[in-house]
């Protein structure tokens, strides 16, 4: 129990506890514990707000513990177990009534002002520039093919002259299907940049000019030699037979020997629908596409895989923006918005990213490390979603804690040590040789004595440190001392005899260098100079 004590009875042969009202002691198990300052700091130079420049108090603060019995006789030092005694220190005002342990950090003034508005985040992938002049896109010039032509041909059951636009659109390849490029306006391609409905003449039999030398228009059906068994002439150099006009048998159904020798051929991917003429196709050519012929209607049936569902949904949702024919009021007018395939691809990427966040990168369950709410990573992700900069003060309490710093720098506690003073008298001392003050002013140190040993502490016999609350056994204040700025600092005071005595007992206390360094003294002796004392 912590309590204030009065002076011991008059006539005691031993020195009693200090009589200052700010200093007091307490009794525990019939013994009075007091604390006395035997060396007071006089002055110091302010160390500022850095952590490397340390300016210790001079001289160092030193306190001693005294224990009195009930008859006011002092207990000998050898009879005291000082293993678990320690003294804590903090900074107070000159009158000892106001605590001065915290000071406002000068660099924290900007944190106390209004928060700066968050800067808008720049988009990672800016949208492609729209066509503001309404001009059609530049034609894509496909590179010539010098190999054998790809065998795209009409279905077997329908003659070439009876092909309807629907069947022809599902069979005839487009430029983007054969070469992986966007279709451009060309005189020979049936899917030019026109915006009106395609005429039936676009699907008639190809002219003879389509089978000339390889060019941008050489995408019609191959010659009859392409349907027979492979031969050297098929894969050899380009010849007139490979690119000449096809015979009438090219468009007829295959013979029974050919049909029995070779399996039916799977058609290539269909061209884009009529609503997307003039826009870039976004079909995924890496997926297998199969085709068959309906026996009742003699029309091809195309089957694709389901991996492009996200992409097709994106194209369907943006068809009005990418197709100028979707709005009757815009009939014949060029489109000024991004194409449907670009917007669909952008939407499919966002959908795929959200799916990876939900299911994991490989489509399975998300096995990544969970993010705890309130953690640093969770706050960073929240800042990324809301567009908040890193420097914005998210937590006001953190900003307020960073505003203040400790005024008293250094170790704020000291263990008990048995030493001899300057008169060779033993005692239990507490040394504070590395204390610094950040700001200038007049202060006092408050010292408090406590014992952290387990019962029967503070009596001898404690086996360890207890985990509860330790009562304060005694309290004492030092005399006021002054902290100066670097320009006003008058200098370090003279070294005391007590500091020299402790230094001789291997206690590292800061001492004033009265004779300078050894090298300077040797140079002065060699040059015949005087050996006057110097102060630092």
Swiss-Prot record:
Record's note on what induces expression: Expression is down-regulated during fruiting body formation.
GO cellular component terms attached to this protein's record: cytoplasm; nucleus
Residues of the Velvet domain: 25-512
PROSITE patterns assigned to the protein according to its UniProt record, in alphabetical order: VELVET
Compositionally biased region (Basic residues): 511-525
Biased composition (Pro residues): 114-143
GO biological process: sporulation resulting in formation of a cellular spore
Summary of subunit composition and partner proteins: Component of the heterotrimeric velvet complex composed of laeA, veA and velB; VeA acting as a bridging protein between laeA and velB. Forms a heterodimeric complex with vosA; the formation of the velB-vosA complex is light-dependent.
Protein name: Velvet complex subunit B
Organism, scientific name: Schizophyllum commune (strain H4-8 / FGSC 9210) (Split gill fungus)
């Amino acid at each position: 129990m912590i309590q204030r004590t009065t002076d011991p009875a008059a006539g005691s042969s031993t020195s009693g506890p200090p009589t200052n009202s700010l200093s007091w002691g307490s009794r525990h198990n019939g013994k009075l514990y007091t604390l006395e300052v035997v060396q007071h700091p006089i002055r110091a130079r302010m160390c500022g707000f850095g952590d490397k420049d340390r300016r210790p108090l001079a001289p160092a603060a030193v306190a001693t513990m005294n224990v009195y019995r009930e008859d006011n006789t002092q207990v000998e030092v050898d009879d005291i177990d000082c293993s678990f005694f320690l003294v804590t220190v903090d900074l107070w005002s000159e009158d000892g009534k106001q605590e001065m342990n915290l000071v406002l950090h000068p660099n924290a003034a900007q944190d106390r002002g209004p928060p700066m508005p968050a800067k808008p985040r720049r988009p990672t992938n800016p949208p492609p520039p729209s066509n503001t002049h309404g001009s059609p896109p530049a034609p894509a010039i496909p590179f010539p093919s010098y190999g054998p032509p790809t065998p795209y041909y009409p279905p077997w059951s329908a003659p070439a002259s009876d092909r309807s636009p629907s069947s022809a659109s599902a069979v005839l390849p487009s430029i983007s299907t054969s070469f992986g490029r966007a279709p451009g306006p060309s005189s020979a391609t049936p899917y030019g940049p026109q915006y009106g409905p395609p005429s039936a003449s676009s699907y008639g039999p190809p002219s003879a000019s389509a089978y000339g030398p390889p060019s941008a228009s050489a995408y019609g059906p191959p010659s009859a030699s392409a349907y027979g068994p492979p031969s050297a002439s098929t894969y050899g150099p380009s010849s007139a037979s490979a690119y000449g006009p096809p015979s009438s048998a090219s468009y007829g159904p295959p013979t029974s020997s050919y049909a029995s020798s070779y399996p039916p051929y799977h058609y290539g991917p269909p061209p884009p629908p009529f609503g997307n003429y003039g826009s870039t196709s976004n079909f995924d050519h890496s997926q297998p596409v199969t085709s068959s012929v309906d026996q009742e209607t003699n029309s091809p049936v195309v089957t694709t895989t389901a991996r492009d569902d996200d992409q097709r949904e994106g194209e369907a949702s943006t068809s009005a923006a990418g197709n100028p024919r979707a709005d009757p009021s815009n009939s014949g007018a060029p489109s000024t918005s991004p194409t449907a395939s670009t917007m669909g691809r952008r939407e499919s990427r966002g959908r795929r990213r959200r799916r990876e966040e939900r299911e994991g990168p490989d489509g399975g369950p998300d096995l990544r490390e969970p993010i705890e709410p309130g953690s640093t990573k969770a706050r960073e992700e929240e800042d990324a979603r809301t567009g908040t900069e890193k420097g914005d003060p998210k937590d006001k309490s953190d900003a307020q804690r960073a505003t203040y710093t400790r005024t008293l720098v250094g170790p704020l506690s000291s263990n008990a040590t048995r030493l001899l003073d300057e008169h060779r008298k033993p005692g239990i001392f507490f040394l504070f040789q590395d204390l610094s003050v950040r700001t200038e002013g007049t202060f006092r140190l408050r010292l408090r004595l406590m014992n952290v040993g387990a019962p029967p502490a503070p009596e001898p016999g404690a086996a360890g440190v207890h985990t509860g609350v330790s009562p304060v056994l005694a309290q004492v204040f030092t005399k006021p001392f002054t902290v100066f700025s670097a320009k006003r600092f008058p200098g370090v005071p003279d070294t005391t005899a007590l500091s020299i005595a402790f230094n001789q007992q291997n206690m590292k206390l800061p001492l004033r260098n009265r004779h300078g360094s050894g090298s300077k003294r040797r140079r002065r002796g060699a040059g015949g100079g005087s050996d006057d004392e110097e102060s630092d």
